[in-house]
Amino acid sequence: MDTLASNSSDLTTKSSLGMSSFTNMYLLTTLQALAALCFLMILNKIKSSSRNKKLHPLPPGPTGFPIVGMIPAMLKNRPVFRWLHSLMKELNTEIACVRLGNTHVIPVTCPKIAREIFKQQDALFASRPLTYAQKILSNGYKTCVITPFGEQFKKMRKVIMTEIVCPARHRWLHDNRAEETDHLTAWLYNMVKNSEPVDLRFVTRHYCGNAIKRLMFGTRTFSEKTEADGGPTLEDIEHMDAMFEGLGFTFAFCISDYLPMLTGLDLNGHEKIMRESSAIMDKYHDPIIDERIKMWREGKRTQIEDFLDIFISIKDEAGQPLLTADEIKPTIKELVMAAPDNPSNAVEWAIAEMINKPEILHKAMEEIDRVVGKERFVQESDIPKLNYVKAIIREAFRLHPVAAFNLPHVALSDTTVAGYHIPKGSQVLLSRYGLGRNPKVWSDPLSFKPERHLNECSEVTLTENDLRFISFSTGKRGCAAPALGTAITTMMLARLLQGFKWKLAGSETRVELMESSHDMFLSKPLVLVGELRLSEDLYPMVK
């Protein structure tokens, strides 16, 4: 019996071992089959991707080094925008691909390609890159303009579009804008009456800064005292200088943006500049914002008077504040920074061009006199009829853009543009410089000719929907307030022309129309001598 039991046990054990061995072999075979299947799928995907890239290659561009790509050349060739445009000229292309680290940078100078990207595929290119500068300015991506695509961007974009820059708000704040335009005129009057030279760059930047501060905070100055002639205080000058410093480095091809492991080493010096400029702006903004939030919470303020009040008072579905202080502060900083550079640059260049071409200046003043007369100053209600003045501004936007490129648009997935493969994560740079000077689009592109923008059948507008040049950017990431930009820019130029005759100081008769070596601004600030053009009793006084 024991022998039988033993034999039975041996058989059971052998059977069990056999089953176990069979099971293990089955599992192993299954795993091998799955692994082989996965390998084939990956191989097929690689082949498909390779086939796709053969069918749709990357845009033309240099090969670059492993890992770093063209970063050595980027560091060697400054400013980078001139290097990129010279590369495109050498390659004879209107779309290129330059790899910086692992990022494909895609500059575009062709309106047709630009429309394909920003009109036909706008949603796909709706994101922003993650950069050190943008992280600092946006307080960790809590804003709208420079925040990558996602729920936070959609939330802030909705707030700005429905509550801040809607037509009703634009009309509501008309009187504030009008007062700032009168203040500009009074400030210029005082300088001209005192025979002071007028630095047009200084004046135009501070007018734009005053206008946006007035709309945002209800005041044009950060100082308790004001200058008697209407000019900015030392505090306002420090704020404006920090703002333009920050603007210059918001997107400046910082090496750590393409090689993130270098963040903190600050090899370009960009990180320190951004921290310091942002801190100066915060120094002036944050106390006002904190005090205003406290007033609303304590019931000491109940009336909405400016944009800051709107941000604080917006409620969510539960009746609670929709925005936190950590969202309000960087959003206000972002909007304040977005206002001054484009209008002030366009007006400075426009007047410089007109000093050299007095026939254009004469036509502009003739139009203002015809539309407005000489018994009152131009107002926003006159803008629709000032077509030649607006044509001058359009031409300044075209030929003398404030920046070489728009902020980068990041591709959310692989796509094809103009027959080229654009990988996910690519940064598309729409070239203001290249679009406006494209000889395939513009005849005699380097000449300043406002007449090219006139159309007898329709009113001239500052927006350019066909992307032949950039005035205010378009699409999901476009300028949120073209109406405000139009009002500020047109009123500034119209008041400068209507109220004053301008000439160069001394014996000079021509402006040297040269761009700065490191950006797109006029190489030297435009300094002029003015003369009153209207009856003295029409000029407003500083309040």
Swiss-Prot record:
It catalyses: L-tryptophan + 2 reduced [NADPH--hemoprotein reductase] + 2 O2 = (E)-(indol-3-yl)acetaldehyde oxime + 2 oxidized [NADPH--hemoprotein reductase] + CO2 + 3 H2O + 2 H(+). GO terms for cellular component: membrane. It is an enzyme of class 1 (oxidoreductase). Heme binds at C479. It is a single-pass membrane protein. It is found in: Membrane. The chain crosses the membrane at residues 22-42. Its cofactor is heme. Its EC number is 1.14.14.156. One of its GO terms (biological process) is induced systemic resistance. GO terms for molecular function: heme binding; iron ion binding; tryptophan N-monooxygenase activity. Its main location: membrane. Converts tryptophan to indole-3-acetaldoxime, a precursor for tryptophan derived glucosinolates and indole-3-acetic acid (IAA). Belongs to the cytochrome P450 family. This is Tryptophan N-monooxygenase 2. It comes from Arabidopsis thaliana. The lineage of its organism: Eukaryota, Viridiplantae, Streptophyta, Embryophyta, Tracheophyta.
